Curated annotation (Swiss-Prot):
It catalyses: UTP + L-glutamine + ATP + H2O = CTP + L-glutamate + ADP + phosphate + 2 H(+); L-glutamine + H2O = L-glutamate + NH4(+); UTP + NH4(+) + ATP = CTP + ADP + phosphate + 2 H(+). The lineage of its organism: Bacteria, Pseudomonadati, Pseudomonadota, Alphaproteobacteria, Hyphomicrobiales. Residues 1-265 are annotated as: Amidoligase domain. The gene is pyrG. The active site is at residues 380, 514, 516. This is CTP synthase. It comes from the Bacteria. L-glutamine binds at residues 54, 353, 381-384, 404, 469. Mg(2+) binds at residues 71, 139. Homotetramer.
C-alpha cells in the first residue's frame, strides 16, 4: 500500500515546495522506492493553459496533452518519471467535475457543499491510481492561510484520519528570515504559520525551514518546542548554487531519513547518490563556458522559460561547460540594430510565444543568425519566425507573415484547423474557446534520413511534445526549400512541418515542438546537447 507525504507551505509563496517535493522524491528513488508526485493547485482556472506567463510562469505539457503547473517539470527532471493528466488538479477542474455530476443527478438531490462533496473529490484525486507506488508525494499549492487553499487543506486533514495509521506524513515548508538590524534569524513567522496550520487540524511531522544562513541549534530547539515537532525533524533548507544541489543538501540534513523514520521504516535501504554527485561535480567544475542569447518576449519573468533554462544547462552538462544566458527582449530589435547585442554570443535561441508583440524582433534575430552563421535554435514560434524570415529575404515574399497577427495575403504561418492524433482526426474552429484547443502532447514526426537533425537524434522517427495553434503553411514548402530551407521533419501524414534546417549553415535548426520539456539532467535532450556543442565551436571563432 502507498504511503502519503503532504507538503504545505507557509509564511510566503515561492519558497520552493515543488523543488522540495522533487528532491525528496529523488532521494526516495535513490533508496529503491517507487515514487509518484502530484500537484494540487488552488486557483479556479481549469488549467494554466490560458494564464499569462507573467502570472503563472511556464505551462508544462505532458505526453498525454495536459497543460500543467511548471512544478511538474521539476518532478519529471528529478525523477525521470513522465507526468500525466492525473498528476495535477486545480480548483477549477474540481468544481467542473462536481457541477457535471450535479447536472447528471449523481448526488440524488442532495445539497452540494464544500464538505463533503468538494473535499471528497480532492481525496479521490489523491488516492486514485497509486497501486504501483510505494510513496505518493502531494504538493499543496499556495500558502497556509489562503482562502483558496482551505478545501485542499481540509481534504488532506481528513485523509490523515482516514488512511491507515502510519501511512500519512505532513511536511511544512517555511521561511526563517534574517533581520540585519537584529543580527539574527527569526522563528516567529514559522511559529505563526504552524499555529495557523494546527488550527485547521494539521500537525506537521517535519519542518523544512528555508534560510540564507546556518540555523543555530538554539533556534532549532525553539522551533521544536513551540511548533511541537521533534528536534531532529526541524530540517534546515539552506540556499544552494543550483537546484541540482538540493537533493544532496537535503540528504545531508537528513530529510529522507526523517521521513522514513516518521513512517516507522527502520532500517531503510541505503541511498545511491552517485549520479546526483556526478551532476553536481560537472556543474561546479566546468571545463569552459558559452553564452547563449535568448531572444524572448516574457524575459521579465524567467519562470516563463523554466524548462528551457534547465534544458540549456543540461546541454552544458553533456558538454562539460557552463552555459551563460543573455536575456534579450525581442521588441528591442524593432528599434535597435541586433548586431551589438548578438555579435559576441555563441548561439541564439528564439523560444515559443504567442501574439504579434516581439515577432519582428525575433525575425531579425533569425536573419542575423542565418547571415552571420551563428548557431540558431528556433522553438515553436522561433521556427515559425525563421520561416517567415526566409520567405521574405530568400524567396522574396515581402508580405510574408502569420495569420496570427493579421489576415495577410501571404500566410507563411497559419491556423491549424485539423490534424491527426493517432487514428483520430482532431478539428478546431478559429472562433472556438482558447482553453485546451491547441495541438497538445506528444506526436510523432518523421525525419529525412540525410538531415542534420536525424543525425543528432540518431533516428528518423521521434516523438515530441507540442503546444501550438499555428503551423508553417505547407503550401510554401517547395519555394522555401528551393531557397535553401530544408523541411527535414514532417508529421507522418506529410501535412504538418515539424523541423527545418539550412544545409549550408553550421547549426540552424527550427522545431515546431518543445524539446525542452523532455530534457533531464541525466539524459540531456540531444538537440540541446548538440546546440551547446555548436556554441562551443562558435566560441572559438568569436
Amino acid at each position: 500500500m502507498a504511503r502519503y507525504v503532504f507538503i504545505t507551505g507557509g509564511v510566503v509563496s515561492s519558497l520552493g515546495k515543488g523543488i522540495a517535493a522533487a528532491a525528496l522524491a529523488a532521494l526516495l528513488q535513490a533508496r529503491g522506492y517507487r515514487v509518484r508526485i502530484r500537484k494540487l493547485d488552488p486557483y479556479l482556472n481549469v488549467d494554466p493553459g490560458t494564464m499569462s506567463p507573467y502570472q503563472h510562469g511556464e505551462v508544462f505539457v505532458t505526453d498525454d496533452g495536459a497543460e500543467t503547473d511548471l512544478d511538474l517539470g521539476h518532478y519529471e527532471r528529478f525523477t525521470g518519471r513522465p507526468a500525466n493528466q492525473q498528476d495535477n488538479i486545480t480548483t477549477g477542474r474540481i468544481y467542473r467535475n462536481i457541477i457535471e455530476k450535479e447536472r447528471r443527478g449523481d448526488y440524488l438531490g442532495a445539497t452540494v457543499q464544500v464538505i463533503p462533496h468538494v473535499t471528497d473529490e480532492i481525496k479521490n484525486f489523491v488516492l486514485e491510481g497509486n497501486e504501483d507506488y510505494d510513496f505518493v508525494l502531494c504538493e499543496i499549492g499556495g500558502t497556509v492561510g489562503d482562502i483558496e487553499a482551505m478545501p485542499f487543506l481540509e481534504a488532506i486533514r481528513q485523509l490523515g484520519n482516514e488512511l491507515p495509521r502510519g501511512t500519512a506524513v505532513y511536511i511544512h515548508l517555511t521561511l526563517m528570515p534574517y533581520i540585519p538590524a537584529a543580527g539574527e534569524l527569526k522563528t516567529k513567522p514559522t511559529q505563526h504559520s504552524v499555529k495557523e496550520l494546527r488550527s485547521i487540524g494539521i500537525a506537521p511531522d517535519i519542518l523544512l525551514v528555508r534560510a540564507d544562513r546556518e540555523i543555530p541549534e538554539s533556534e532549532r530547539r525553539k522551533l521544536s518546542l513551540f511548533c511541537n515537532v521533534r528536534e531532529s525533524a526541524v530540517i534546515q533548507a539552506l540556499d544552494v548554487a543550483t537546484i541540482y544541489d538540493v537533493p544532496i543538501a537535503y540528504h545531508k540534513e537528513g530529510l529522507d531519513s526523517e521521513v522514513l523514520s516518521a513512517f516507522g521504516i527502520d532500517p531503510a535501504p541505503k541511498p545511491r547518490m552517485d549520479r546526483w554527485e556526478e551532476v553536481s561535480h560537472r556543474l561546479h567544475n566546468p571545463e569552459g563556458e558559452v553564452t547563449i542569447a535568448v531572444v524572448g518576449k516574457y524575459t521579465g519573468l524567467k519562470d516563463a522559460y523554466k524548462s528551457l533554462i534547465e534544458a540549456l544547462h543540461h546541454g552544458g552538462l553533456a558538454n562539460k561547460v557552463k552555459v551563460n544566458l543573455d536575456w534579450i527582449e525581442a521588441e528591442v530589435f524593432e528599434s535597435e540594430d541586433p548586431a551589438p547585442y548578438l555579435e559576441k554570443v555563441h548561439g541564439i535561441l528564439v523560444p515559443g510565444g504567442f501574439g504579434e508583440r516581439g515577432a519582428e524582433g525575433k525575425i531579425l534575430a533569425a536573419k542575423f543568425a542565418r547571415e552571420r552563421k551563428v548557431p540558431y535554435f528556433g522553438i515553436c514560434f522561433g521556427m515559425q519566425m525563421a520561416c517567415i524570415e526566409a520567405a521574405r529575404n530568400l524567396v522574396g515574399i515581402e508580405d510574408a507573415s502569420s495569420s496570427e497577427f493579421d489576415p495577410t495575403r501571404e500566410p507563411v504561418v497559419g491556423l491549424m484547423t485539423e490534424w491527426l492524433k493517432g487514428n483520430m482526426l482532431e478539428k478546431r474552429a478559429a472562433a472556438g474557446d482558447l482553453g485546451g484547443t491547441m495541438r497538445l502532447g506528444a506526436y510523432e514526426a518523421v525525419l529525412k534520413p540525410d538531415s542534420k537533425i536525424a543525425q543528432i537524434y540518431g533516428s528518423t522517427d521521434i516523438h515530441e511534445r507540442h503546444r501550438h495553434r499555428y503551423e508553417v503553411n505547407i503550401d510554401y514548402k517547395d519555394r522555401l526549400e528551393a531557397a535553401g530551407l530544408n523541411f527535414a521533419g514532417m508529421s507522418p501524414d506529410g501535412v504538418l512541418p515539424e523541423t527545418v534546417e539550412y544545409a549550408d549553415h553550421p547549426w540552424f535548426i527550427g522545431v515546431q515542438y518543445h524539446p525542452e520539456l523532455k530534457s533531464r539532467p541525466f539524459e540531456p535532450h540531444p538537440l540541446f546537447a548538440s546546440f551547446i556543442e555548436a556554441a562551443i565551436e562558435q566560441s572559438r571563432l568569436v
